[in-house]
């Protein structure tokens, strides 16, 4: 089993299936790894001489595929995702790529189906299955690897969350910005007791406006 590869990034390309491929030279051998597009952009921008990529090997009848990730936590999350029935490697990478590590874990732990349904190819039923099968596992795992997630007990109801997200997304805010706003507001015990969705949205916009 290959745990990681350390070497020189030769090129980052998109293949005919629109998948991001990193060619990594290790001891004069070029390895092809499929990686999240975000990692591909980082490698292209940083132009480092040597990088370390954590790997997952998938062996099929006719080929061996290497998947690469920037951290062991990201790789482990990928492995957890592909353990879910109906979730293949491409869907797992799409989830990690679209949502990022912390946001994806938070969406699973809190059962936020709307967020989990955002990546292309992930329908509502699939998102529900991911949350159902991984919620307990990831609640324990994220503590061991140090992934920070706002506790579901210290957040507004799922109905309020979805209304906030729908409204703020329509206003042009990103998922990352929205989650930060909700996380910050959820630290206020008075806000947590507030069931008025409009006030949550108003406070979230006010908080987000401070950073603009």
Curated annotation (Swiss-Prot):
Subunit text: Homotetramer. Forms an RuvA(8)-RuvB(12)-Holliday junction (HJ) complex. HJ DNA is sandwiched between 2 RuvA tetramers; dsDNA enters through RuvA and exits via RuvB. An RuvB hexamer assembles on each DNA strand where it exits the tetramer. Each RuvB hexamer is contacted by two RuvA subunits (via domain III) on 2 adjacent RuvB subunits; this complex drives branch migration. In the full resolvosome a probable DNA-RuvA(4)-RuvB(12)-RuvC(2) complex forms which resolves the HJ.
Coding gene? ruvA
Which keywords appear in this protein's UniProt record, sorted alphabetically? Cytoplasm, DNA damage, DNA recombination, DNA repair, DNA-binding
Q: Which GO terms describe its biological process?
A: DNA recombination; DNA repair
Protein name as catalogued? Holliday junction branch migration complex subunit RuvA
Q: Which domain of life is it from?
A: Bacteria
Pfam families per record: HHH_5 (PF14520), RuvA_C (PF07499), RuvA_N (PF01330)
Give the span(s) annotated as Domain II. Answer: 71-149
């Amino acid at each position: 089993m290959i745990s990681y590869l350390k070497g020189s990034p030769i090129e980052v390309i998109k293949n005919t299936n629109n998948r991001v491929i990193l060619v990594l030279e290790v001891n004069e051998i070029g390895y092809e790894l499929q990686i999240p597009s975000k990692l591909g952009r980082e490698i292209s921008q940083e132009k480092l001489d040597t990088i370390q990529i954590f790997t997952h090997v998938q062996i099929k009848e006719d080929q061996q595929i290497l998947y690469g990730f920037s951290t062991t936590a990201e790789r482990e999350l990928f492995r957890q995702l592909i353990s879910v029935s109906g979730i293949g490697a491409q869907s797992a990478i799409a989830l990690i790529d679209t949502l990022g590590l912390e946001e994806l874990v938070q969406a699973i732990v809190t059962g936020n189906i709307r967020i989990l349904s955002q990546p292309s190819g992930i329908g509502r039923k699939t998102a529900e299955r991911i949350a159902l099968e991984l919620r307990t596992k990831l609640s324990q795992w994220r503590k061991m690897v140090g992934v920070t997630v706002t506790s579901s007990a210290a957040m507004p109801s799922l109905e309020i969350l979805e209304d906030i997200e729908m409204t703020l997304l329509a206003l042009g805010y990103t998922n990352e910005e929205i989650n930060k706003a909700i996380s910050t507001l959820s630290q206020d015990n008075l806000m947590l007791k507030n069931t008025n969705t409009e006030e949550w949205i108003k406070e979230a916009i006010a908080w987000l406006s401070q950073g603009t």
